[in-house]
């Protein structure tokens, strides 16, 4: 069985050499009520002591700390305060460190790290490993030869673990909080309602009056898809042109990093769109309201609707390379993590 308990703490000592950081930029990006000043150097650290490769995802813990995961095994996890000061770092073996979710059991915070090399690891916030979920073949779900490259997790109200196998099978796999397999959700890779083209992200949406639902990314199809927690398809939220990463809920709004953007082809009388190509270094952030309407695209074009149809969204300002995640603090500032961005540290967007 690949659900394993681990008692060891994997911690890397660090030395944080404080240097003066540039003042906040006067440049304002975004639209409507969601505008931000750009602070590109907010998360910069001494590269010799605390290097990064890809800054993949970030979460906010109950202490107000910002916790980031990346794929540099000198320090997979960086913990910042809101000023950009490094508080801690740990993790030396997550070569595919990619997804990061946080869950509180009522008293303590726990992290779920997705390593795209084939595992999901539950840890404490100081790096102690508590559980590992490995290849689904151990549960009779897939054959051993079936690729398993998890990209994201979401934790249900009862502690169930939903794993998006975004770089592998394109299913979402549901486990109990103790790591027992329940079901697989979706129909694998494809364009049908219950299928995904890169199931890159997943989150629990508690904003509605009814039961919580799953929002699952279909990145190459430029959309999120909504399912019940038991895996029944509900609806599609199209975001033409935007190769979105995971959905992030904060209050009534939905945020996502757009890894890159592209012109799309609209089908006559059909809400489905097809990207024509992917353009490198064309990322931005997109923000949707509770009804699923795009209200702001920091770094991107102003959202435009024609006859109720959202038009193609593209990068407008060359501030970002590839936005891989966005984290929101209690003051509604944004922190943007990037993939393939010349080893850039997280960028802060201050709400104005």
Task: Label each region the model flagged.
Residues 40-49, 91, 130-144, 148, ...:
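Surface-exposed loop and turn segments in beta-propeller and other repeat-based domains
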Residues 68-69, 113, 163-164, 216, ...:
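Residue position within the beta-strands of beta-propeller blades
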Residues 164, 257-282:
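Short, conserved, GDST-rich strand-edge loop motifs in beta-rich repeat architectures
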Residues 322-352:
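Blade-level signature of beta-propeller repeat domains, shared across WD40, Kelch, NHL, RCC1
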Residues 16-40:
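Blade/loop signatures of beta-propeller domains
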Residues 48-63, 93-110, 138-160, 191-213, ...:
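Beta-rich, blade/repeat-based domains predominating
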Residues 1-18:
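N-terminal export signals
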Residues 71-72, 116, 166-167, 207, ...:
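Short loop/turn segments immediately following the C-termini of beta-strands
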